[in-house]
Amino acid sequence: MGLCVAATTGTIVAWIACGTLCFCYTRLIDGRNKKIWLLTLFLLALTGCIYTRTWADAVAVLGMLLLWLAIKVHTDGKYHPTWKDRPDGRYVRSAAPIAVITPFIMPDRCGANILFDESVEITELDRYVRAKRRAGMPSFGMTHAIIAAYVRTVAKYPAVNRFVAGQRIYARDEDIAVCMTVKKEMTKDSPDTVIKVHFHPGDTIQEVYDKFNAAVLSAKDEMENSGVDDAAGILTSTPRLVLRFVVWLVKLLDYFGIAPKFLLELSPFHGSVYLTSMGSLGIKPVYHHLYDFGTVPAFIAFGRKRRAEEVHDGEIVERKYMDLRFNLDERICDGFYYASVIKYFLRLLAHPEILDIPPETIEKDIP
């Protein structure tokens, strides 16, 4: 009886020690406590077990010691992936309690979306586009300007680059993944595919132009052999039950944040924002739904240019506008933050010359 009690006590102590170590470890490497004294005190406490010659606990001490020696403390001041992080995002540990609870109240992205529309006067933007084409960017268009404006907006308001997965909030930090559907030719029978282009918050309009054009050209050249289409083709060739199981399995892995990185990169449903150009189709922008699968928290659609007559200084003047429609996941940031994001985004489109130079500072999201 005494041996059983001793063994049970030793097991409980070992589990408590392991839990304490994990707690100290996560607090140390996620930046909430940058001193090593927590681990040092814990090691001293375990060393006491060896001093008292309680050999049943000595094995646990050795195991804990090996774990302690395996802990890698980073002193470069940068964030390093740790517990609860995903391959495509960092877990936001200091989010407000209401923000943490919200994904449990509204678990689906389509049930947490907000719709917003805005118009931007594009006289200056039109001039800017024409100037860029004359300056050696022959294919420069509104799409490049909108992407660059969004990238610069993330540099100032990084919380808009978050996403919700597995009912947790994650931050992409300096990786901005822009998704867009492209067609090889503007005909109804031409195949289409999805491109995903990665940008950095410090990118200028020139870097955005180069990265986006390279991705579009690559997609059009390899339209018949794109990774997204190949993967979809393999899945659709299987029986429905198999396909349903595969999709369920991918969703399960994605929920727990353990889906392989290559799969997340292939998926058109995982990214920072999805853009769609209705202007190239000659129609007004639509309110496009968000996807419950994946991580994309924002959908931005922009339509054809339109003219409007207005009264200015007692005279009727004609101005050109472009309409934009947003579908946003309200769980990643609050309404005040979103309002600031939209206003800054529109200001950049009204004064696109700002995008020619790198941002003075790149704001960091909360830990």
PLM features: residue spans?
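C-terminal catalytic/motor cores of large multi-domain enzyme assemblies
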Residues: 3, 9-17, 21-367
